[in-house]
Amino acid sequence: IVVYIWGDNGSSGEGQNGTISELLAQNGIPSTVEQHIAALEELGGLDALGTPATDNQYHAAWAWAGSSPYQGMKLLASHLGGTRNPMFVSWPGHIEPDPVPRTQFHHVVDLVPTIYEILGISHPETVNGVPQDPIDGTSLAYSIDDAGAEGRRRTQYFEIMGSRSIYSDGWMASATGPRLPWVQGMPAGIQTWTPDQDRWELYHLDEDWSQAHDLAADHPEKLAELKELFAIEAARNDALPVGGGLWVPVMHPEDRISPPYTAWDFAGDTVRIPEFCAPALGNRPNRVEIRLSVPDAANGVLYKLGGAGGGLTCFLLDGVLTYEYNLFLVQRTVVRSGAPLAAGDHTVEIVTTYAELRPGGPLDVVLRLDGEEVGSGTVPVSAPLLFSANDCLDVGRAYGGAVSRAYADRMPFALDGRIDGMHVAYL
């Protein structure tokens, strides 16, 4: 049995005004078109789009168009453009091909009970001794052989970051919420927002499947009924408080899920530690100490976190100790030692502290060689969440994307020396 769902909730509006590094949006960092164009020119102009040098994303207007004929996009649970996806089911020898689409309302939680029913098995009460939660879904197997069968899913709620909706027997009530994916920075008024402030819309999907006609003013009693039902379903499914998902990405990035450790010791050949599991070198006060042995005019990466679309790195370039903080391509901060390292054994330290303790606040960076300060600088804006959703921490070389353009054409730019160990500690 092959079940294929095409989509990621909806088209992505995180490109905002069009971006060369989409995690600017997730980090809530405002930027201008002029900044993007200037950075793109440094990368080679339009030809750099779609290459490993960028992490580009289309303008949010294309996301809305991509969700057509529905309203909305990913990160909006209020409208079907952010929740509805086509699904295909294939079971050769058991399901005959049928060009007639099934229009019954269903949710992804319905897939497991569907497979259970098709295979004639039941939901296990325990797995490895762990009691299992009850199944919430409703099997859609009944619709496989009967395109016109009456739908069996009566109710379904949706919620993300305060954007929410509730479906019930052909009707849907929708509240957009305080955050629009295409608006940069913190939502206006978010510090005093409450869900009670939001305006609700009402649609009769049985007659208006694309949510073109808001009936809230015509059927206030129906809207009130569905709003109450949303509160019941949200409570039953542990989805309260409404808008709780705004806490980390918008208001308190320091509370994001992260490793419990405060210190690490890495071997000199450690590579491919996902950023989610690695030390937060770009937004937590920290000290990195590296014991190494190098020849004259040594070259190579000491470590890097993130990738081409954003990250930080420390490397040697003709012996010069160099630190670079790449803020999603639109801002690069480089700190260098005044003189190259001499051949031999050394201890390199990179100390990072906040100049202003706030999400996205500026960072002071100090480079030390064998206990002596050899360089310092300030990163004007830091990344409050993370640099990359798919790149890593590497020691002694750089895999994935090149954080610095200084070694982009020399990847993986392995150190032509030896790292005996790297110690990282939060301050």
Write out the residue ranges for each language-model feature.
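C-terminal, low-complexity/hydrophilic appendages and adjacent surface loops
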Residues: 65, 69-85, 158-217, 222
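Metal-dependent active-site segment of extracytoplasmic phospho-/sulfohydrolases and closely related
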Residues: 1-17, 44-48, 64, 368-371
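Short, solvent-exposed loop/turn and secondary-structure capping segments
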Residues: 1-2, 13-28, 98-99, 117, ...
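Beta-strand elements within well-structured catalytic alpha/beta cores of enzymes
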Residues: 1-10, 86-89, 111-116, 203, ...
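Substrate-binding rim/cap in mid-to-C-terminal beta-strand-loop elements of soluble/periplasmic
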Residues: 24, 31-150, 321, 325, ...
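Active-site regions of oxyanion-processing enzymes, predominantly non-cytosolic
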Residues: 1-23, 80, 143-144, 225, ...
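Active-site rim elements
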Residues: 57, 72-76, 95-106, 123-131, ...
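Extracellular glycan-associated modules
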Residues: 241-427
